[in-house]
A protein has these predicted regions:
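Primarily short, surface-exposed interaction patches in extracytoplasmic proteins
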Residues: 229-303, 314-588, 623-624, 644-703, ...
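Mature extracytoplasmic enzyme cores
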Residues: 119, 163-167, 247
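Catalytic cores of secreted or luminal carbohydrate-active enzymes
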Residues: 109-128, 632-639, 643, 647-648
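Bacterial N-terminal signal peptides
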Residues: 8-19
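Long, His/Glu/Asp-enriched segments that create or flank divalent metal/ion-associated functional microenvironments
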Residues: 581, 589, 597-598, 602, ...
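N-terminal secretory signal peptides that target proteins for export/translocation
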Residues: 1-4
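Periplasmic/extracellular electron-transfer cofactor-ligation site
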Residues: 39-62, 124-134, 389-404, 544-545, ...
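Solvent-exposed helix-loop boundary motif
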Residues: 24-116, 133-160, 167-234, 264, ...
Length: 720
């Protein structure tokens, strides 16, 4: 049989296998049994025969995305030398996996193993590709699917496969397991979960035949059940969080003090520190509603639009190298204006998706120029607006999600009509024609359809992007609102309900599903109003909690029982240094007086911003912005000539303080208000006065030293 003669010959070979009698045993075929087994043994992993060039002359498709090709490689390539139909036990396949002959992957299936027996039975049965009449797999489930577990507990999982004829089968031994957080729980190849010593919620994924299922473990804090205090609810967020904390045997920290809240909310909403005067005004205010009033005021400041335009410019890839200087600036101005006017987020998404016409008049269309091709566009839209990563599915079945190659290319199809042409008004974006998308492996035509939907028989009429935009912004869309509120929650609370924030999938469940659903419903109810959602989140008691832990939540970094420490973003920290020293930073290509948060151009060269993790906007992944602390950052803050120059600047704040205040206590207090938005404690005041007093003949230099020490403190570098 010659495969090269056509698909019909291959199909005939696939249907009948080799011309051997089928033994009277339980049916075994390639698609339902051998493919899962090879995946289970790691044969088609990217580190083995699934790598691009294969391994030792034998190549399988990674994660079995091309079963027909894998069948051909195993049974027909190299003159069929891997299978011996007349002497099944002598097949090279069996001799390799059992260790009878040398195998780079080692012994994968000893002769007395269940895996070896299954391979042997398949060969004896004639190596059928499929057995006619066998039911198809519809879903898998894990037993148990959810459980409360103690520290160091073990739980065996069972994977049950459900088929089209309503039968089910235990396929645990053919399944692949993966833990989302190995610090909280590990899982072995047999599906036995071992809980660690961390409090919270975690999940373990099982995969079989492209289907996935999850097991969720809730791990409460050990010890006697705590008496949960009666706490006031600021809004719907708090009782949902409290209910979760009760299950975990955790008591939340108390509310933060006014100074902590003041600094936190300025940094989170406006991306800057409050001035000393702003701090004094707020701290001296005794009215009961001053916190919500401050939030309302900050949302109407120009700094709000500056900071949130920076965040969206990262996501939407405002990149001068990609777009050119003028076009990148137009794109940024459109984003900034949209946020300044509080454009509903569904409108913003729709305008980006359906932009058409001259780009000078429709700057939202630059979103399309930020992508390299239609596949890149599909991946960008999915990740930015749905929080779904589909890039893996370009080449193969997503290993941790349900997305297939067909799903990926169906999303591509929505953008296949989009072209650019020169017009009287400059470069214009058009959506025209009815181009087709073909499956790269099978050649079958794929009609565009959104993620999770079914493929229609005919392509959408007109501009296909409107179909996608309507689906995406529909109130019942399972991704759009959840993705947006998860990103907002991560910004304000330091961690998403789903982590990473742009990786929403069935196998990566939220730490508090009820809260994510409630936040998403609130966003939809409030017509996707960004400012309203910010008010809701910042008004909650949960957001306003202190970062100081108690005995029950000392190790909690997942369940929002206390505020988390967050290193300031690069631009915000640079501006904070400028605010404390009173000396602006000079950035190349922009007038003096520009704050780092206002920089629309991510390609402006600046050592500090690069060191502290400013993204280059090469991708839409939140992970491109580095928020962790490093030794290099600490050394730079301590030794930077630029910072030393700002401290000693003749027009800077340090010189003004020494000239305007004869009382050293006033200077110490002003520095603390500027850096920390609070007055110094008694001990801090005494330490500051003692230091300044000991250097009275070098008073200005001593004030510089004190300011330097504050800017190098944990309290300055982090939001808390």
């Amino acid at each position: 049989m010659i495969i090269a003669r056509g698909a019909g010959v291959l199909l005939a070979m696939i249907c009948i296998g080799f011309a051997l009698p089928v033994h009277a045993t339980s049916p075994v075929d390639f698609t339902n049994d051998i493919i899962p087994l090879m995946s289970r043994l790691g044969c088609n992993a990217s580190a083995c025969h699934g790598k691009a060039e294969g391994q030792n002359g034998f190549k399988l498709s990674v994660f079995a995305h091309d079963p027909v090709g894998d069948f051909r490689a195993l049974t027909r390539e190299s003159r069929g030398r891997r299978i011996s139909p007349t002497a099944p036990a002598d097949s090279l396949l069996l001799r390799k996996i059992s260790g009878a002959v040398g195998h780079g992957g080692g012994v994968r299936a000893p002769r007395n193993s269940r895996a070896y027996s299954l391979f042997l039975q398949w060969i004896k049965n004639g190596t059928p590709y499929e057995i006619g009449g066998r039911p198809t797999l519809t879903r898998i489930r894990l037993e148990p699917s959810r459980q409360t577990a103690a520290f160091n507990a073990s739980q065996p999982l069972k994977v049950m496969a459900e088929f089209s004829d309503n039968t089910h089968r235990d396929v645990t031994w053919l399944s692949i397991f993966h833990s989302n957080d190995t610090g909280m729980a590990t899982v072995d190849e047999k599906g036995i979960v071992t809980i660690g010593n961390s409090v919270g919620q975690t999940s373990v994924m099982a995969r079989y035949q492209g289907k996935v299922a999850t097991f969720q473990a809730i791990v409460p804090r050990p010890g006697p059940k705590v008496t949960y205090p009666h706490l006031p609810n600021h809004n719907f967020i708090d009782p949902i969080v409290d209910s979760h904390l009760k299950r975990l045997n955790i008591i939340p920290s108390p509310l933060s003090d006014d100074a902590t809240f003041l600094r936190r909310v300025y940094l989170d909403i406006a991306g800057r520190l409050p001035t000393a005067n702003e701090s004094e005004t707020f701290l001296s205010d005794s009215t009961s509603g001053k916190r919500s009033g401050l939030v309302d005021a900050l949302l109407e400041t120009p700094e709000f639009a500056d900071y949130w335009a920076l965040k969206w410019a990262d996501l939407l890839r405002v990149d001068r190298l990609k777009l050119g200087h003028e076009d990148a600036h137009r794109y940024y101005k459109w984003i900034h204006e949209s946020l300044s006017k509080n454009k509903p987020l569904d409108h913003l998404a729709r305008e980006l998706l359906t932009a058409e016409g001259p780009l000078t008049e429709q700057p939202a269309g630059f979103f399309y120029r930020a992508a390299n091709n239609t596949g890149d566009m599909a991946a960008m839209v999915s990740q930015v607006f749905l929080g779904v990563r589909i890039t893996c599915a370009e080449c193969h079945q997503h290993p941790y999600d349900r997305w297939t190659q067909q799903d990926y290319h169906a999303m591509r199809g929505f953008f296949q009509q989009v072209t650019t042409k020169n017009s009287a008004g400059g470069l214009a974006l058009l959506a025209e024609g009815n181009p087709t998308i073909k499956h790269p492996r099978t050649g079958a035509i794929i009609q565009p359809y959104p993620l999770g939907e079914s493929m229609p028989e005919e392509p959408p009429q007109g501009d296909r992007r409107h179909v996608l935009a309507n689906w995406m912004t529909h109130p019942e869309n399972p991704y759009f609102a959840r993705n947006l509120v998860n990103r907002l929650w991560a910004h304000f609370l330091g961690k998403g309900l789903i982590t990473p924030v742009d990786d929403l999938r069935e196998t990566n469940p939220p730490s508090n599903p009820e809260l994510l659903d409630a936040l998403a419903a609130s966003l939809v109810k409030n017509n996707y109003d960004l400012k309203k959602m910010i008010r809701i989140i910042t008004h909650s008691r949960t957001y306003q909690l202190s970062s100081k832990p108690n005995a029950t939540n000392l190790s909690d970094e997942q369940n929002f029982s206390r505020a988390l420490f967050r290193r300031l973003p690069a631009e915000v920290l640079m501006d904070a240094v400028c605010d404390v020293t009173g000396v602006d930073e000079k950035f190349d290509g922009v007038p003096r007086g520009y704050r780092a948060v206002q920089l629309w151009d991510s390609q402006v060269q600046h050592y500090f911003l690069k060191l502290f993790g400013r993204p280059a906007r090469a991708t839409v992944c939140e992970c491109e912005r580095v928020t962790g602390a490093s030794m290099g950052q600490a050394l730079h803050l301590m030794n930077s000539p630029n910072i030393q120059t700002k401290l000693a600047h003749e027009g800077g704040r340090i010189k003004r303080l020494t000239l305007e205040h004869e009382d050293d206590a006033d200077i110490v207090r002003q520095l603390y208000l500027s850096a920390f938005s609070r007055s110094p404690s008694r001990d801090e005041m005494n330490t500051g006065l003692q230091y300044l007093g000991s250097r009275r003949f070098q008073r200005r230099k001593a004030v510089e030293d004190l300011a330097w020490s504050l800017m190098n403190s944990f309290e300055f570098i982090f939001n808390h």
